[in-house]
């Protein structure tokens, strides 16, 4: 595969998975000590990657989970937040301004702070009551985040008696690395062709729903806009017909991200309409990917898998547009 280091990728996956035992001990301790609610506090991509976690929790649990934008959270006087809140953060660099400020704010309020970070010895590590370090660069960051966050959310639900199959699912997830490599391999040619075709396209729509809505938001803003400087709109499939439909034309690039949860009919509705109007509809679907988990668990892995697939498109866009993904 073009510009892909399999050994580096597999190491990111295995390092993230290796956090599970220590994470479980901390999560169990926090659960049995008791906490009022869970706050997932992010900015940019980390905010986006928290959205699927909230979606999953809402389908499985009555546990109060709040996903908030870090800068806004500090200013808004959120009445759900208190010293009894468990606050989770993620930062690749370890010095993200808004995250550092939010952790400081939570600490001053007496709340418990737990962070995932890719670089040790950074402010996020130093400020958080608990921190877990697992190195990743931007291209494989979401895999690292999701594998950590799955342990957090599903362990909490397991302790609440709302996800009793925790050990079974995670024993299967432990062997996921080669399946993610295969997902990239099977997406390679499509991604190469799509990137070549869209090398000069100046506007995209990215559509998602359910557990992959956060990835649609992330891909539009953090990859196509931030890293490729392409005007892009992320659209929830359920909202497409309430405005965006009017901008769909024959040459409109529409990238559909399909997960495997109950919201697939929303995506089908967009596809069935948009494909009659636009000749530029592309589909990335996690259902096409073989995974080592039981069918009923696949929906929870869909945001991780869609991110893994999209990395191939990003890599080829970088080449075709001669525009680095580090910008």
Predicted regions and their residues:
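Glycine-rich phosphate-binding loops that contact phosphosugars or nucleotide phosphates
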Residues: 31, 36-167, 209, 257-286
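Short basic, glycine-rich beta-strand/loop surfaces that mediate nucleic-acid
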Residues: 84-86, 249-258, 295-306, 310
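Aromatic-enriched
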Residues: 174, 282-286, 303
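Active-site phosphate/pyrophosphate-binding segments
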Residues: 2-37, 138-141, 154-235, 325-327
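Structured C-terminal subdomain patch of bacterial secreted/periplasmic proteins
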Residues: 275-276, 287-325
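Structural motif
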Residues: 21-26, 72-79, 241-244
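Internal helical hairpin/lid segments
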Residues: 213-281
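Glycine-rich, charge-decorated loop segments at or immediately adjacent to ligand/cofactor-binding or catalytic sites
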Residues: 120-130, 244-247, 290-299
